[in-house]
Amino acid sequence: ISVVDYIDRAIEWAAKYNIRVLLDLATVPGGQGDSNDSPATPEAVAEWHSSTNGRHVALDVLERLADRYGEAESLLGIELLDTPQMSVRKSLFTMTDGIPAHYLRNFYRDAYELVRSYMPEDKIVVFSSSGHPSEWKHFMRGAKYKNVYMDLHLYHYRDEYALDITSPRGLTTAISRNKRELKEAISTGFPVL
């Protein structure tokens, strides 16, 4: 059974049981650096942006998904890329590993245009905050962008407190961080998942 057959089934079942499906491009050639399979997975690399065809393959897959399912009543929308690791400023002269923010922004704009050409405006288009919600404050704010959501993805297994997450201190720290990130995300003006 192909992946498309499983998606077809999910769309059919969702229609039957009156639920909605959010399709998510979970991985891309070269990797987007999320490695969110399990805490035991080694740190992933984000080489997708520097591969010769990674961007084109991702856009092709998104176009195929939007073309096939964009009009389905049970489709909630499409998430353009799942938790890519974005490169951010570490200090005055250094950046963290990951995909440059300008590359992600350009990809998201191009992907939005592509999927929106197949999907009506009542379907949502979702982009990942990449763990830095405040970096997206003025992004996709023009009138041509309709029904755009930000995915926050509050993960903890890779942060500095992951080993202590079950202790009172670890839980307090995680809750505090979640509140801060959620507040930052809401301040961008996007609906937040």
Where are these regions (language model features)?
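Extracellular glycoside hydrolase catalytic/binding regions
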Residues: 60, 67-70, 74-77, 81-193
